[in-house]
Amino acid sequence: MTYTFIISDESVNADGFVIQTKGIRTERFKKDPVMLYMHAREKGVIGRWDNIRTEGSQLIADAVFDENNPLGKEVKERVDGGFLRSASIGLSVLNYERIDGVDTVTDCELTEVSIVDIPSNRNAVKLFDKRGLIVLSLKESADGDKDLRTQLIEVLKLPATATD
């Protein structure tokens, strides 16, 4: 069975900004297309992403779960059951601009894609009969890297204490 997800698009997410699909650099990610659960590196890799591609303004990928990993198997079962249907990207912002009154990431590097319970982009979902879209979290990554979080807070002009 193929598990195809829209992992990004150009809709305004819950954090109030847009990520331009053409500005997402995927070359490095394609060499190590890790799938995490809830952006938690400490839980390990639960799978990989294959067939990463752009269709119009959507970035799409196929999920391959590591069923030898207990969490990977559990997450796959939740996706099969329809209990988890969303994805979220982790990225490093390289450039952003205000376009048509909306903060817009115009250049970034994709670092990981996670299966998540609640995405900030309502369209970052598993594809069934309908097509959906992305997610980006302000949570600090498990490895303590705060660069993305800090950059996003600055871009969105949020207080330093902002959280998801």
Question: What do these predicted ranges mean?
Answer:
Residues 1-32, 136:
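Polar/acidic, low-complexity leader/linker segments enriched in S/T/G and N/D
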Residues 2-4, 32-33, 50-145:
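Residue microenvironments linked to proteolytic maturation
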Residues 11-12, 41-43, 66-69:
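Short, charged/polar surface micro-motifs in flexible loops or helix N-caps
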Residues 13-14, 43-45, 96-97:
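Flexible loop/turn segments at secondary-structure boundaries
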Residues 18, 42-45, 103-104:
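Short, solvent-exposed loop/turn motifs
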Residues 20, 85, 161-163:
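A diffuse structural propensity rather than consistent per-protein peaks
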Residues 27-54:
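SsDNA-processing nucleotidyl-transfer enzymes
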Residues 134-163:
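N-terminal leader/targeting segments
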